[in-house]
Amino acid sequence: MRANDALQVLGLLFSLARGSEVGNSQAVCPGTLNGLSVTGDAENQYQTLYKLYERCEVVMGNLEIVLTGHNADLSFLQWIREVTGYVLVAMNEFSTLPLPNLRVVRGTQVYDGKFAIFVMLNYNTNSSHALRQLRLTQLTEILSGGVYIEKNDKLCHMDTIDWRDIVRDRDAEIVVKDNGRSCPPCHEVCKGRCWGPGSEDCQTLTKTICAPQCNGHCFGPNPNQCCHDECAGGCSGPQDTDCFACRHFNDSGACVPRCPQPLVYNKLTFQLEPNPHTKYQYGGVCVASCPHNFVVDQTSCVRACPPDKMEVDKNGLKMCEPCGGLCPKACEGTGSGSRFQTVDSSNIDGFVNCTKILGNLDFLITGLNGDPWHKIPALDPEKLNVFRTVREITGYLNIQSWPPHMHNFSVFSNLTTIGGRSLYNRGFSLLIMKNLNVTSLGFRSLKEISAGRIYISANRQLCYHHSLNWTKVLRGPTEERLDIKHNRPRRDCVAEGKVCDPLCSSGGCWGPGPGQCLSCRNYSRGGVCVTHCNFLNGEPREFAHEAECFSCHPECQPMEGTATCNGSGSDTCAQCAHFRDGPHCVSSCPHGVLGAKGPIYKYPDVQNECRPCHENCTQGCKGPELQDCLGQTLVLIGKTHLTMALTVIAGLVVIFMMLGGTFLYWRGRRIQNKRAMRRYLERGESIEPLDPSEKANKVLARIFKETELRKLKVLGSGVFGTVHKGVWIPEGESIKIPVCIKVIEDKSGRQSFQAVTDHMLAIGSLDHAHIVRLLGLCPGSSLQLVTQYLPLGSLLDHVRQHRGALGPQLLLNWGVQIAKGMYYLEEHGMVHRNLAARNVLLKSPSQVQVADFGVADLLPPDDKQLLYSEAKTPIKWMALESIHFGKYTHQSDVWSYGVTVWELMTFGAEPYAGLRLAEVPDLLEKGERLAQPQICTIDVYMVMVKCWMIDENIRPTFKELANEFTRMARDPPRYLVIKRESGPGIAPGPEPHGLTNKKLEEVELEPELDLDLDLEAEEDNLATTTLGSALSLPVGTLNRPRGSQSLLSPSSGYMPMNQGNLGESCQESAVSGSSERCPRPVSLHPMPRGCLASESSEGHVTGSEAELQEKVSMCRSRSRSRSPRPRGDSAYHSQRHSLLTPVTPLSPPGLEEEDVNGYVMPDTHLKGTPSSREGTLSSVGLSSVLGTEEEDEDEEYEYMNRRRRHSPPHPPRPSSLEELGYEYMDVGSDLSASLGSTQSCPLHPVPIMPTAGTTPDEDYEYMNRQRDGGGPGGDYAAMGACPASEQGYEEMRAFQGPGHQAPHVHYARLKTLRSLEATDSAFDNPDYWHSRLFPKANAQRT
């Protein structure tokens, strides 16, 4: 069985190595190491040989042919030219061994300890079948080992071979006996040396026929026909490239004694530096890189690192490096989740040489004293020393029992970190209790306890712990993390002298002596505190770095009275002990050290400085002149000045011709690559339909092969898979197209992506300027979706990094483009499910594209359900119906669109920052929403609020959103106000550039892949504009006044949807001309503003949110079954009619002034036509936000920017604020809420109260106010406010700092109708729904 397993492993290695090219395109295959052991019958053995050696040229190992039948066809062995190990032929019945091309047997492994060729017992005693010929006609070299050919009854001509001409080692044993006797003679042309009777079977002699001048092989008898010294097996000429085989290594066809070394000597820096042309030894071949299943050990390719080295990855190269002690070894711990509950005699040996414990370590009394119930004997205390190698414990350390004769825990003297990833009992990461004989802790190397509490109790003899400063060990806050009690009192310890060593600092110590200090008062050497380092005396001399003593380099000469060195390098010595080569002290001058152009030789002068030898010295020297060279004297060939001049001129001409040719070739390849890249990016494929009755669909995506895609690095990971940066290498092409590869896997394992589905074809057929087009897909066990690589990254990262360079025009244009992309997806029936700023990518600084759509529908239904335990579910971007019922529609995407726009307007703030995800659904049910961003007017904010309506049918469509943002993008400063901060006396600097030139070059050129991505801009007909104009702010943005801000920043908070006095406050401040804007709504709790870097951290469910799943399941169980109102019902149409009925007709589509990218430019509407604000989706009125009903049944949305309408006159303006019944923001008061009925209320104007000290120039209006003619000075139509008796929503007063309230205004107070109950936020409460939707006036309750 063991031999069979070995064959299977070698077969696997063969399949990996087969077909690889090394050296001169040699087909390399692995050998075997089974000896005379065989598995199965002769037929099975033959099949194994065939799989291993078909078309093989170089056998990396041993060629073993054992127990093969007489009718076996071994002609597949004829290609073998070299065997690195031995050749074993035994117990076979075939007549001829066809190895006519075998030239060299290296003998790196020998059979029976001494034979490179072993042939024995190749006959059948019951038949005439036997081995008769060894056709090794080309075998001319056995580098190591002897020959054994015995007991082959029918094998002939073996005694005619001159084995000394083949075997290099003269002392090698050669045994040839007891073989065939009745053999025909050799052919006369062979002169008695042959492998068979024919004239073609003569032995080729390459040594014994050579002239005496030849040291090895030759290709003729003349003295000038000697082979190169590096040849093996003969040659066809005198050069190292004429060898039949190489004695040592084959470097690109030339035989060399060693492969190019990884380090070469630099004459300028006097250092060994990495050789850019290094190669590694792979068998007898020099290769530029080892096969993927090998690692580099110094200069060789090996299958595994030796025991004292570990495998590391350096710049993508797997290498073996010394461990510097014990090599890292991770071991399983004890406790919860482990097979063992405690360390005991049954598992203690499993911790030998462990450096890292994955889990916990528990020391209980049942482990040390034994467990009779489980028949586990007592633990030998001496075996606890295996833990001296442990440096890290990822979980906790629990010591509740310890051997009586051990008075500390010094077996953990090398422990540096306790991770606390899993905690014991009440959250302890270090627990030491009831160890009656322990006097000190002894954790001398412990530097960090990452998490958890410390419990040290009931250790009657324990001292020294009183002195420890635990804040230096604990990470994070230390309050309430220490529970140390009932140990030996401090006064008793002091009385017995059990105090810290005087060399310890005030940080305390773990035990007695200078080696147990937490930190040192002066210096430390090897973890032991000392008074001073050996600066001026003592051995070895030292220098100090961060109060740590380090030894000087061994080549530094110890100095008296002054410092010997100032660092650890050989170039930091004050004086060298032996020689100095440049700035470095060395033990000897370089002698034959490999340099960039050959070996380097130097000699020491009288000052022991290393000086270079003459350039013609090839074996060293003793001086600078040519006559000082060691060895043979070289004859110099004089050259005239004319010859030198002609040589230089000819060289320059050749160089210029090569440069010109290279440039032309490079340009031609560049043009070809551009054309090929354009062809592949633009061209789609027609894929046959899955149903024969369907028509073939034009699918823009391709079906890739796995060999065409190459992943370079991981860009990120999300809910459905991992995104890689990679390249697409079309089959048969040499171009590399940069792409993004998203690997989608079904975690349940129930779905395979082997077949191409209709949904995959649907995704592949999508093509729009504002969605990331799918270039293709690669089916398989995991589905790979391939899109074009956009180096500018996500829109979320962009707005965070360049918030100081983003203007309102660009922000609104991005909103238009995202809406257009989502509208295109809606037209094609594609629900996104995960729209967020992180899933919007920048194709250019002015064009964005929606990405990551349609991925969820590729997985089975169970995997698309909302799982609160999933670590990356975007709860904060999801609509309520998606959170509670797993319902995803285009209108749930509208909700996510509103959150995405909010992210843009807050420059990448995290939604609901500071809130646990379990609180978000309840918060949304109560009617609270994200707060109004600081740069947004009420118009823009109301568009967001409409996207967050409870009833999905009331939310706008993406077409309406695109039209609305297009309208706003024509006058950006009117809707977005961005104020730049500048201090007094500081002139505002130039507007910062959004991107550096380097990043812009990355958009056009990917240097790593040698591609010009400027082609993408040409394909899309993008205008070549500078980045400064793309990111510039409109004129006047910097000087627009800003209102006062709330003390609690709303940019990262949320807003209750039922703030009754918000509109009134805003109206009053806007109408009165005050420079102070109305305070923004704030959250119930202060929330810190924050933003995280990855998709998995931005508002996604974490492991600590397990309670949310329970809440949702309870909410679902209580919810009533309701049929959602279809989009086509009367209420929906009436609302859409009110939103889309234009007052002034819009310009036809052909005249719409925007570019192909949806980038709308300001001030482009017709001069003679006033811009209409009612023809597109407008901002919702406060009464709509608050859940009240309008008087007019046909109009359920109130426009914030009203025109003069022919309507019945308003009621007379009240004479006082008390008559209005309004409730204003209570500055400085506590937050309160009220909830009333859902009766409709009429609109009343707001009285204008002038504020002292304000001027008309300070006034800034968000809305387009037109004269209404209603009352004195009233040129503004107030938004609807209800008296207290008619309000059907909550009112909230926001905190505001002192000084923001006009002193002369008196505010009326409203009494709340009833307090908010818990059932008001439940889905099964009809009052909740009717209080937050916008039904018609005659809507019936259900």
UniProtKB/Swiss-Prot annotation:
GO molecular function: ATP binding; ErbB-3 class receptor binding; growth factor binding; identical protein binding; neuregulin binding; neuregulin receptor activity; protein heterodimerization activity; protein kinase activity
An annotated GO cellular component: ERBB3:ERBB2 complex
Entry annotation: catalytic residues: N834 (proton acceptor)
Bias (Polar residues): 1042-1075
Keyword Mitochondrion: no
Post-translational changes noted in the entry: Autophosphorylated. Ligand-binding increases phosphorylation on tyrosine residues and promotes its association with the p85 subunit of phosphatidylinositol 3-kinase.
Signal sequence extent: 1-19
Glycosylation sites: N126, N250, N353, N408, N414, N437, N469, N522, N566, N616
Amino-acid positions noted as binding ATP in the UniProt annotation, renumbered to this chain: 715-723, 742, 788-790, 834-839
Domain notes for this protein: The cytoplasmic part of the receptor may interact with the SH2 or SH3 domains of many signal-transducing proteins.
Clinical condition linked: Lethal congenital contracture syndrome 2: A form of lethal congenital contracture syndrome, an autosomal recessive disorder characterized by degeneration of anterior horn neurons, extreme skeletal muscle atrophy, and congenital non-progressive joint contractures (arthrogryposis). The contractures can involve the upper or lower limbs and/or the vertebral column, leading to various degrees of flexion or extension limitations evident at birth. Erythroleukemia, familial: An autosomal dominant myeloproliferative disorder characterized by neoplastic proliferation of erythroblastic and myeloblastic elements with atypical erythroblasts and myeloblasts in the peripheral blood. Disease penetrance is incomplete.
Protein name listed in UniProt: Receptor tyrosine-protein kinase erbB-3
Organism (species): Homo sapiens (Human)
Gene name tied to this protein: ERBB3
